Design a protein with these regions (language model features):
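Catalytic cores of secreted/periplasmic lytic hydrolases that degrade extracellular macromolecules
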Residues: 2-185
Length: 185
């Protein structure tokens, strides 16, 4: 039943994306912005649905997907991997090893090779992200434990990602693309 709802929201997102090229041209957006707007249209409604059902901010979920996947353009986010959130490990026994950059917690980047989850579908990626945040380690990102999305992004900094400016980057994306509209139900 839930997969039917996710499929419906994916379809709604696809239909909504048909209007975005017209809107982006009117706003004189760059090609990068147009790519991001199309990516938001692809995952926005499903993210809204999943976030609402799981005490999360859809705006943060979408901003993380934009940042972690380069608006769905990174190698890791492409078919058949669909890892929009940079989640390491395995998903149903599936993973891929790729080079990545980490932050030592003091703003100094370093390179590692890491195994990342491979999902096989957009829906699996979004659903697994929600499940990934269910543990007590991420309790500070839940709506019921925060006053705003900014509290949630602050709770992710240094925890979800080693980047010491992670929350600031997410806040900037949320504001630039007005993602808080996805936090309403």
């Amino acid at each position: 039943m839930e997969s039917d709802f996710i499929g419906l929201f994916s379809l709604l997102g696809l239909l909504a994306s048909l209007n975005f090229p017209r809107l982006t041209m009117e706003k004189n957006m760059t090609p990068t912005d147009e790519t991001t707007v199309a990516f938001i249209a692809e995952i926005g409604e499903t993210s809204r649905y999943l976030a609402a059902r799981n005490d999360l901010y859809a705006s943060v979920m979408i901003a993380q997907a934009i940042l972690e996947s380069d608006s769905g353009q990174s190698q890791l986010s492409q078919k058949p991997l669909y890892n929009f959130f940079g989640i390491k490990g395995e998903y149903n026994g599936q993973s891929v090893t790729l080079p990545t950059w980490e932050d030592d917690g003091k703003g100094n980047p370093y390179h590692i090779d890491a195994a990342f989850r491979s999902y096989g579908s957009v829906e699996n990626s979004l659903q697994d992200y929600v499940e990934f945040l269910e543990g007590s380690y991420y309790v500070g990102v839940h709506r019921s434990k925060t006053r705003s999305y900014k509290d949630a992004t602050a709770a992710l900094t240094g925890v979800y990602a080693t980047d010491t400016t992670y929350g600031d980057k997410l806040n900037s994306i949320i504001e630039q693309y007005q993602l808080t509209i996805y936090d309403t139900y």
